[in-house]
From Swiss-Prot:
ATP binds at residues 148-155. Produces ATP from ADP in the presence of a proton gradient across the membrane. The catalytic sites are hosted primarily by the beta subunits. It comes from Pseudomonas entomophila (strain L48). It is an enzyme of class 7 (translocase). This is ATP synthase subunit beta. It catalyses: ATP + H2O + 4 H(+)(in) = ADP + phosphate + 5 H(+)(out). Belongs to the ATPase alpha/beta chains family.
Length: 458
C-alpha cells in the first residue's frame, strides 16, 4: 500500500501528497493513520498531490499526518445482513446492535445498467392515497418525486407511502436519510419497528449535522444496497429523503474543490451529479427498483436549478402546495400540478383516465371562477357554473384523507382506499350522485361510503 501525507486542510477538503509513481486513482478511499477518518479522492492536482473529501469530521487532523491508499473505492455491506440495521455512509452500524456480519461488500461507485440490461413495465403500484392513485399513479419500477417547500408534508407523505407500500408489498426496502433531521430518522426507525417490517428494511443515515462528504455519498451507499437486492431478483423499494440535500452537499464542497459556481451558486456539475445517481436507480431484467424521493423546493420555487434538474429523471411528480395546506386539506397534493407518465388510457384504462381528467377540468374551472366569485359573489354565476363550483368544492375536500402515520396528531384513524373505490367515489361526485350531501361530509374521509355515513351525522 502506498502512503502519503496531508499537506493542506480547508474545511472538509484535504490535499494529500503521494510519491509520483503511486498517485491514487479518483474515487479511491484513503485512510488517515492514527485517526478514524476516511477520505475520498476527487481530483489529481499534479505533482503527486490529490484533493480529497473527508467522510467525517476533520477536527484533530493536521499537516504531516500519514495517509494510506486502500487502492479501492469506499465499499459498504450488502445483502440480507443489512436488513433491520441502521448504518452510516461507510456501512458502519450506528444502532449499537453489534457488527453487521455481512458476507459481501460492494464499492459505492458502480456503472449504471446498460441499455440492453434495462427493463420497463407498466404495472401500477397502488398506494392507498386517493389523490395520488387518481391523478399521478405510480409505476412499479418507476421513479417518483415528492416536491414541496418547507413544512408542507413531504416527510409525512413519504412515511405514509412507506407504511402503505412496505406493509402491503412484501419485498425489501432501503431508506436513505440524506441530510435530514435526526429526529425524523429516529421516528422512522420506531415506526418501522412498531409496524413489524423492520426486518425487511435497511436504513442508511447521513443526517443534517454531518460533514458534506457524508451527505454527498450516503445516497450512493443506500443505492448500492438496493442494487444488490435487485440483482438477486427482488423488487426493491428505495426511499430517499431528501434529494435536495444531496445537491446541497455537492454545492458545499464544489467551491472548496476549486470549481466556479454556476446559476444561483450551485455547482457547475449539478446535472452530471444528479444523473450519476438517478441513472443507477433503474429496473433490470433481474429485478426492479421503485424509488420514491422527497425533493425540497427552496422558497417554493419549482424553477430553482436543483428541483428543475430532478424533474427530468422522474416518471411521476407529486407536487405539494402551500395554498392547499393553508385550506387544511391534507395530503396537500396539488392535483393540477402533479403529473405521471402512467396517466394514459392505454396503461390505466379509459374509466380511470376520464375520471382523473374530468376532476382536473372541474378544479381548473373552479380556479378560474374564483376571481369572479371574489368580486361579484356566487349569485352572479350561471346555474351550470354554480353546480360546477359546488362539485369542485366537494372534490377538493374528498381529495383529503386521514393518514395512519398522523393518527397520533389528528386523533382520527388512518384510511387505505383501494383504486376501485377511489375511481367510483370521484366519478359519482362528477355525475352529481352526491349533490344533495353537504360538502363538509367529504372532508377527511376514506371511501365515498364514509362520506355518506358522515353526512347522516351532520
Amino acid at each position: 500500500m502506498s502512503s502519503g501525507r496531508i499537506v493542506q486542510i480547508i474545511g472538509a477538503v484535504i490535499d494529500v501528497e503521494f510519491p509520483r509513481d503511486a498517485v491514487p486513482s479518483v474515487y479511491n478511499a484513503l485512510k488517515v493513520q492514527g485517526a478514524e477518518t476516511t477520505l475520498e479522492v476527487q481530483q489529481q492536482l499534479g505533482d503527486g498531490v490529490v484533493r480529497t473529501i473527508a467522510m467525517g469530521s476533520t477536527e484533530g487532523l493536521k499537516r504531516g499526518l500519514d495517509v494510506v491508499d486502500t487502492k479501492a473505492a469506499i465499499s459498504v455491506p450488502v445483502g440480507k445482513a443489512t436488513l433491520g440495521r441502521i448504518m452510516d455512509v461507510l456501512g458502519n452500524p450506528i444502532d449499537e446492535a453489534g457488527p453487521i456480519g455481512e458476507e459481501e461488500r460492494r464499492g459505492i461507485h458502480r456503472k449504471a445498467p446498460s441499455f440492453a440490461e434495462q427493463a420497463g413495465g407498466n404495472d401500477l403500484l397502488e398506494t392507498g392515497i386517493k389523490v395520488i392513485d387518481l391523478v399521478c399513479p405510480f409505476a412499479k419500477g418507476g421513479k417518483v418525486g415528492l416536491f414541496g417547500g418547507a413544512g408542507v408534508g413531504k416527510t409525512v407523505n413519504m412515511m405514509e407511502l412507506i407504511r402503505n407500500i412496505a406493509i402491503e408489498h412484501s419485498g425489501y426496502s432501503v431508506f436513505a436519510g440524506v441530510g435530514e433531521r435526526t429526529r425524523e430518522g429516529n421516528d422512522f426507525y420506531h415506526e418501522m419497528k412498531d409496524s413489524n417490517v423492520l426486518d425487511k428494511v435497511a436504513l442508511v443515515y447521513g443526517q443534517m449535522n454531518e460533514p458534506p462528504g457524508n451527505r454527498l455519498r450516503v445516497a450512493l451507499t443506500g443505492l448500492t444496497m438496493a442494487e444488490k437486492f435487485r440483482d438477486e431478483g427482488n423488487d426493491v423499494l428505495l426511499f430517499v429523503d431528501n434529494i435536495y440535500r444531496y445537491t446541497l452537499a455537492g454545492t458545499e464542497v464544489s467551491a472548496l474543490l476549486g470549481r466556479m459556481p454556476s446559476a444561483v451558486g450551485y455547482q457547475p456539475t449539478l446535472a452530471e451529479e444528479m444523473g450519476v445517481l438517478q441513472e443507477r436507480i433503474t429496473s433490470t431484467k433481474e429485478g426492479s427498483i421503485t424509488s420514491i424521493q422527497a425533493v425540497y423546493v427552496p422558497a417554493d420555487d419549482l424553477t430553482d436549478p436543483s428541483p428543475a434538474t430532478t424533474f427530468a429523471h422522474l416518471d411521476a411528480t407529486v407536487v405539494l402546495s402551500r395554498d392547499i395546506a393553508s385550506l387544511g386539506i391534507y395530503p396537500a397534493v396539488d392535483p393540477l400540478d402533479s403529473t405521471s407518465r402512467q396517466l394514459d388510457p392505454n396503461v390505466i384504462g379509459n374509466e380511470h383516465y376520464e375520471t382523473a381528467r374530468q376532476v382536473q377540468y372541474v378544479l381548473q374551472r373552479y380556479k378560474e371562477l374564483k376571481d369572479i366569485i371574489a368580486i361579484l359573489g356566487m349569485d352572479e354565476l350561471s346555474e351550470t357554473d354554480k353546480q360546477l363550483v359546488a362539485r369542485a368544492r366537494k372534490i377538493q375536500r374528498f381529495l383529503s384523507q386521514p393518514f395512519f402515520v398522523a393518527e397520533v396528531f389528528t386523533g382520527s384513524p388512518g384510511k387505505y382506499v383501494s383504486l376501485k373505490d377511489t375511481i367510483a367515489g370521484f366519478s359519482g361526485i362528477l355525475k352529481g350522485d352526491y349533490d344533495h350531501l353537504p360538502e363538509q361530509a367529504f372532508y377527511m374521509v376514506g371511501s365515498i361510503d364514509e362520506a355518506i355515513e358522515k353526512a347522516k351525522k351532520l
